[in-house]
């Protein structure tokens, strides 16, 4: 059985006072998946999300399941939110990031978002 998963392809965030907006780009735009198989989603930022003051990379991943609000999966690059199964992992550095699902389950279907947290409007 194959399950459809929808991904948000482009997020643009306006940052006042910034010389240019931070643009977040996700690939692929959609991803057919098979239960039990691995899957990964890539995210690229137009600017580094590494905070030189504290060494943290402010990139989060969210999953919005059908009919529900988005739920936090991964925060600050690689930390799983409470209750998130360990089949989810986040990695990357600077401007290139990956969300990996080691073994896809039916409940993983939804819209996945990457979000930068280094600058806010």
Swiss-Prot record:
Region (Complementarity-determining-1): 44-60
Residue ranges of the region described as Complementarity-determining-2: 76-82
GO annotation (BP), single: adaptive immune response
UniProt GO cellular component terms: blood microparticle; extracellular exosome; extracellular region; immunoglobulin complex; plasma membrane
Region of interest (Framework-2), ranges: 61-75
Disulfide bonds: 43-114
Residues of the signal peptide: 1-19
Region (Framework-3) residue spans: 83-114
Region (Complementarity-determining-3): 115-121
Residue span of region Framework-1: 21-43
Cellular compartments annotated: Secreted; Cell membrane
Keyword presence, Disulfide bond: yes
Keywords: Adaptive immunity, Cell membrane, Disulfide bond, Immunity, Immunoglobulin, Immunoglobulin domain, Membrane, Secreted, Signal
InterPro entries linked to this entry: Ig-like_dom (IPR007110), Ig-like_dom_sf (IPR036179), Ig-like_fold (IPR013783), Ig_V-set (IPR013106), IgV_Light_Chain (IPR050150)
GO molecular function: antigen binding
Occurrences of domain Ig-like (ranges): 20-121
Pfam family, any one: V-set
Assembly description: Immunoglobulins are composed of two identical heavy chains and two identical light chains; disulfide-linked.
Function: V region of the variable domain of immunoglobulin light chains that participates in the antigen recognition. Immunoglobulins, also known as antibodies, are membrane-bound or secreted glycoproteins produced by B lymphocytes. In the recognition phase of humoral immunity, the membrane-bound immunoglobulins serve as receptors which, upon binding of a specific antigen, trigger the clonal expansion and differentiation of B lymphocytes into immunoglobulins-secreting plasma cells.
UniProt-recorded name of the protein: Immunoglobulin kappa variable 2D-40
Organism: Homo sapiens (Human)
